[in-house]
Amino acid sequence: YGCCGWAPDDAWLHSAGASLWVDGAHISTISEERLTREKYDGNFPDLSIDYVLDEAEITRDEVDLVVYVESIHSTPRHDAIETVLSREFPDAKISFCDHHQAHACATFYTSPFEKASILSFDGAGNSFPNNTYETGLYAIGDKQKGIYVVYHSINGAKEHSTFNLGQAYNNISRWCYSKMEPKKAATIINPYIFMETAPGKIMGLSAYGNKDKVDLPDLFKINNDKFYFPYIYDHRMPTEPQMDKYDPKDIAAWLQDQFETILVKFFSTITIKAPNLCLGGGCGLNVLANAAIIKAGLFKDIHIFPAANDSGLCFGGAIYEVSQKEKKMAMPECLGFLGKSYSDEEIENALQ
């Protein structure tokens, strides 16, 4: 099984990579950026594919199944991707896996839990022709029965605009960064790649601020077991003039507190829940929020896949198919090191 991430001529795609599995066993996974040295490289992962195939000493002609993380619903881009992948892997079946399904599979199946609640959430997932896109997924995972999706959030339709904490964090992080580093913000070449990096910086900045200095309405609401960021509909998103009254570090502290508070409230009130929790998606890398969930004592244990952001999609997409087709899966022993091993001699030669 192979999985790669990329889309033709799409500047909004990033973090391409490839993951190879053989007979239910993980062989190797790598991000294209590790080989091209271009941060968040979203081009077709030629080097990643060659890297993982070389480890198993097989060719592209020998790959049986290729999984691509993209909406399972057909779109013009979907068809273009399938055409290219069929050309690159002539004897392989081409399959698709939804963005947040891939995140969910990556974090749940690498966890030690037989059953767990799963939350995957980030800025955005798959986009659809009607200008809507995924923002999150809440599910219950069972290693014997699979993953049961409780809520799958589609942003842009009011009744489904839930789990979009990542969008809020991205938007306000962008404002904070533009105030702290105006020259850098003005020269951003790819705004989406910028959005990948800004939230982590603002999470760090929050430690220097004071949330109590900010007097703004709460960002999020909870309704029927779902949290959402309703600024699109009732203008709860603070305007720039409103935020301009405050120091960016205080806005960062307020934003982080809002983020943590709504997560703890959600897990406190959710009616469908398992004893343990798995987090995926870029928001799963918010260590302060994760600590707040742990401190609240709402779960026995929590697991976060190290590559919770989109660099782990190729890994999760492959697991999506492997979990359905193989009776047993052999996970890598160390989730922080998914590439191939190197001998002492190879390391010495590289250093020389």
How should each PLM-predicted stretch be described?
Residues Y1-Q352:
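Short acidic/glycine-rich loops and adjacent helix/strand connectors
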